[in-house]
Every structure is written in structure tokens, then in C-alpha cells.
Amino acid sequence: MIEAVAVDIDGTLTDASRVLSPVSVSVIRELEVPVILVTGNTHCFTRAAAVLFGVRHFVAENGGVISSDDRIEVVGDRKLCDEAYKHLKEKFNIKKFDSRYRLTDLVLIRGFDVDAASRYLESLNLPVDLVDTGFAIHIKNRGITKGTGLRRISERLGIPTKRIAAIGDSPSDIPMMEISGFPAAVGNAHPSVKSAARYVADRAFGEGFAEIIDHMRAAGMI
């Protein structure tokens, strides 16, 4: 039995233009189990989205910020990300999105060799990773993922992660899918995400999310 649903926002609850899908809002509001928003977006954005969805629990900044019933925990170290960006800028033609609202990671504009940049950071022995969310590249603390964030929320709720469904579209969602009891992917998901999923929706974006919830209901999971 599934006791909670963890779901990514961009690309999963939105359309292709990152506009929230009305059908996903309706589906979430009708769910009778707790919903956990798990995203790479900022804390302030995720908090606003939680209000729109009527959700009390979320993980923001790819696991760096956890909030449950307005109790916020910051677990990432922004200074390490700033140091990594300084080194990368000296060697690669990169630019970051300036956001004073980010607490634990940095966001880079796409268009550079991510694999080469990752290897360079490895050579410097900096405990950070580059993560592609499908919309941007994030510099984040190593060991902090959507999976670690979901685990913290599950502990607060007293719900084992194997009783939580995890739904997403990008590789950054895989860590939370791997620890969940029912990993699922929307139709527009990256191939690696589909491979990690137990169920892959035929439909994309918010419509795909609705399809997954319908499947879970039909199977008696929720």
C-alpha cells in the first residue's frame, strides 16, 4: 500500500513551457494521501507551489532544503558550490543564473561540456556534483540528492520510503525513485528515468502524472 506520493514539479506537474498543469493541480488536491513536492527549484518557488497545490511537505534545491509543516531544514553548504563555480569559470565558458533566493546550490546556464566539467571538479577533489535537471545544470553538494531529501521527509512523517511512490522525468529524480516503493515516470521522461521506473505513462507532463495516479488507484495502491 502506498501512503504518500513524492513528485517532481518541472516537466512532471507542468507542461513543456514549465507552466503548472491544471489537471495535475486537480489530481493532487483530490489525493487522500500526503503529497511531497521534490524539485531542484528554489525554496521560495517551491513554497509558493506548495500553497497552490495545497501541499504541506516539500524538498527543494535537489535535497538541499527540506520543509514539512513549515519546519524548514537547510542541509547544503553553498560555500562549496561557490568555490566550485570559481574554479570552473577559470577553465570553462560558463555563466550562472543569479538568484539570491538559492540557499544551497548554484544553477548554470546550459551550453558547456558537462562531462568535462565534472571530470575537472573530480581532479580538484571538491565534494560537489554537477546535476542536469533537464532545464539547467546545478552545482550541488555531493551526497545531497532528492533521495536524501525524501528520506528526511519520510522520517518526519513516519512513513517508510518503500511506502512512498516517486514520480519524475529527469535523471535528478532517479535517487528518490530508487528508494521508493513505486517509481514511475511521465511519458516525456529521460530514457534513464524510464529505465528506473516500474510504470511509464503513455502521456507526457501533467497528463502523464494524472495517468500514473489513475493506474495506482486502479491497482488498489492508493
Swiss-Prot record:
Recorded superkingdom: Archaea
Sequence positions that bind Mg(2+): 8, 10, 169, 173
InterPro entries the UniProt entry points to: HAD-like_sf (IPR036412), HAD_sf (IPR023214), PGPase (IPR006382)
Keywords: Carbohydrate metabolism, Hydrolase, Magnesium, Metal-binding
EC assignment: 3.1.3.18
Cofactor (UniProt): Mg(2+)
GO cellular component terms, A-Z: cytosol
Gene Ontology MF, one: magnesium ion binding
Catalytic activity: 2-phosphoglycolate + H2O = glycolate + phosphate
Residues that hold substrate according to the record: 146
Protein family membership: Belongs to the archaeal SPP-like hydrolase family.
Identification of the protein by name: Phosphoglycolate phosphatase
Organism of derivation: Methanothrix thermoacetophila (strain DSM 6194 / JCM 14653 / NBRC 101360 / PT) (Methanosaeta thermophila)
